[in-house]
Amino acid sequence: MEPKVSVGILWNKKITFILNEAYLYEGQETSGENTVSFNDGKIVWNGSAYDELYFEPQYKDASFTIKDVVIGINFHWERKEDQEFQGALKLIVENETITAINIIGVEDYLTSVISSEMSATASLELLKAHAVISRSWLLAQIEKNREIIAQEEKYTTFIETEDERIRWYDREDHVNFDVCADDHCQRYQGITRANSNIEIVKQAIEQTRGQVLKSENKICDARFSKCCGGIVEEFQNCWEDTKFPYLVKLRDDDSTQDIPDLTQEQESIKWIHTRPSAFCNTQDKKILSQVLNNYDQETTDFYRWQVVYTQTELSELAYRRSGIDFGTIQELIPIERGTSGRLSKLKIVGSKKTMTIGKELEIRRTLSESHLYSSAFTVDKKDDKFILTGAGWGHGVGLCQIGAAVMGEKGYQYNQILLHYYIDATIEKLY
């Protein structure tokens, strides 16, 4: 039987939504524009206070619109837009604010994710591959959440001492729903964007209905990112120290060349400062447009890129982004790298404080107004400037979306694409 998923859409003191067709609240029919506000630990709606509200669609195709949903949170493309959703709407109180949650069947959720994460102009094989990994990742997260709750132990994603801050970003925020709608989980925008070439997306979902990746009899935590930069990263270098047999280093091409050991600094420098052949090393706009939505295409350099800061800019930025007063930053010293060359530990040497930070997303957040494209970068100092030369976009674990798009164009079938990125996994039908 197809499961349902609860998706966190928006957090705000005040939320305006429109029930576009008839919805039921405690058996009473309601529709039209509504506004709820947070007051004294309750949700205020139509003059009354509630702990939570649940609106059930009266008809299968009924939809609701939430105004001013923030997309691309903390990324360079952050913006607000009105978004339309099918399924049920649940409103709860969480952290002194109101959270809007969409409850919907997994396959309908996937239809939106595929057209939100990828352009719907992608090849059918790429869309099918993405359907399987998105379904696998989602069901693995739901299972992981149950395990965390059952353990009763606090799920730790933060380790800080006097001279070290190690943090990873994964499940820590989501207690009252399964996943969020932003890039923190999987980009989900309801049926807002699910209208463009929707038939091929539905075809990809239907042809892979219920299919997931499995390894050692468990659903795979099938991670993916925009561009690995030529070599895929391993899970434990980005999140908790758990090694998965299907999320291991591999070269993103069809050659049998040796994989350089990018945990070694000199090998990383050599790799990042060249453009080795890889599926994801492409400038083909037709292929890129399959993966990158319009707001993603504001970025064009991702296989190899460069960012330059003055010493003053870097010092002020790191203080503002991390809250740590390093003083004037004198050195950025790579301490530990993963298999793709991504830094998992970086020492920041300042006139007031020296501290090692990690993992990859903490490094990316500290050294950018939003996020550096990746933590696979080298550091060169020239006069008062710090030059960061980097590779790839995202954490680099699992499927490389641009690499997979190139494979689809080259004629690879979806199962071949999946088994290239997820080593020794199997594809199985759950329902």
Kindly give the residue locations of the regions a language model identified:
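Conserved, single-site charged/polar hotspot
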Residues: 1-431
